């Protein structure tokens, strides 16, 4: 039995509130169970120096946790002087994941900044950030298109992420903090709407794992991501093959299994 009573392949309740920030081109508050992340997508009319003059845009991410996002207060990273290695790793993962969903040439010389601020952490903060970021970025791209600031909508596909792991010799989906801290194996999976992989990161925590374990984690993860993309489709109507993307008139959505 899992700590919260879920079945092995069951997602936590998921809640998404759109336009949580009134200033950003796209924003959501996304909740995976007790994990809560504010995600904003902001557009700048400039690109990093290595892209100047190329006609290509860029997507990058920043990630942080407020001091009391977890059981004990932590210092803000700005006070410590620099982001931790974990923070750098998560920021790069979020950026890579969203770049997989956007045609950077169609974006033109613009940068989309994704800011992910964890206000409560109970496992899966990075995958919640990625899943919520797609909606925020999609809203930003749709806004750019409607304002004729890009020639065509740069969105290519949906993208979402989920955690899977092996806890007490059982493969489970969407780990909370208790499960994550006791996991024998931890995997983060990022996939597109077409079912293609952006990232597979599986690590044994002082344990090894078998091909059978890996296959089952992959099976659970793919199934979880398919459900997450269905949730994204409640907010964003997309037909990637013809470049059709529309914002649906929905402010909030709650999903429970």
Swiss-Prot record:
Its EC number is 2.7.7.56. SUPFAM superfamilies: Ribonuclease PH domain 2-like (SSF55666), Ribosomal protein S5 domain 2-like (SSF54211). Gene3D superfamilies: GHMP Kinase, N-terminal domain. GO terms for molecular function: 3'-5'-RNA exonuclease activity; tRNA binding; tRNA nucleotidyltransferase activity. The keyword Glycosyltransferase does not apply. It comes from the Bacteria. Keywords: Nucleotidyltransferase, RNA-binding, rRNA processing, Transferase, tRNA processing, tRNA-binding. It is an enzyme of class 2 (transferase). It catalyses: tRNA(n+1) + phosphate = tRNA(n) + a ribonucleoside 5'-diphosphate. CDD domains: RNase_PH_bact. Phosphate binds at residues 86, 124-126. NCBIfam families: RNasePH. Homohexameric ring arranged as a trimer of dimers. Belongs to the RNase PH family. Phosphorolytic 3'-5' exoribonuclease that plays an important role in tRNA 3'-end maturation. Removes nucleotide residues following the 3'-CCA terminus of tRNAs; can also add nucleotides to the ends of RNA molecules by using nucleoside diphosphates as substrates, but this may not be physiologically important. Probably plays a role in initiation of 16S rRNA degradation (leading to ribosome degradation) during starvation. This is Ribonuclease PH. It comes from Sulfurihydrogenibium sp. (strain YO3AOP1).
């Amino acid at each position: 039995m899992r700590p919260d009573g879920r079945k092995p392949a069951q997602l936590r309740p998921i809640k998404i509130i759109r336009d949580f920030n009134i200033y950003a081109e796209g924003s959501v508050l996304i909740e995976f169970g007790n994990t809560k992340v504010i995600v904003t997508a902001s557009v700048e009319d400039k690109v990093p120096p290595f892209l100047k003059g190329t006609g290509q845009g860029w997507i990058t991410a920043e990630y942080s946790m407020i001091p009391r996002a977890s059981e004990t207060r932590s210092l803000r990273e700005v006070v410590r002087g620099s982001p931790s290695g974990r923070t750098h790793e998560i920021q790069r993962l979020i950026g890579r994941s969203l770049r997989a969903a956007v045609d950077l040439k169609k974006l033109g010389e613009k940068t989309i900044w994704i800011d992910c601020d964890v206000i409560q952490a109970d496992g899966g903060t990075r995958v919640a950030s990625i899943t919520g970021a797609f909606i925020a970025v999609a809203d930003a791209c749709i806004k750019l298109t409607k304002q004729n600031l890009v020639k065509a909508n740069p969105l290519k596909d949906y993208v979402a992420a989920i955690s899977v792991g092996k806890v007490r010799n059982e493969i489970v989906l969407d780990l909370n903090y208790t499960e994550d801290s006791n996991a024998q194996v931890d995997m983060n999976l990022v996939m597109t709407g077409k079912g293609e992989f952006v990232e597979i990161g599986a690590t044994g925590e002082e344990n090894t794992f078998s091909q059978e374990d890996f296959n089952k984690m992959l099976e659970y993860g793919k199934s979880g991501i398919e459900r997450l993309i269905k949730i994204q489709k409640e907010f964003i109507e997309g037909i990637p093959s013809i470049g059709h993307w529309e914002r649906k008139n929905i402010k909030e959505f709650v999903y429970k299994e």
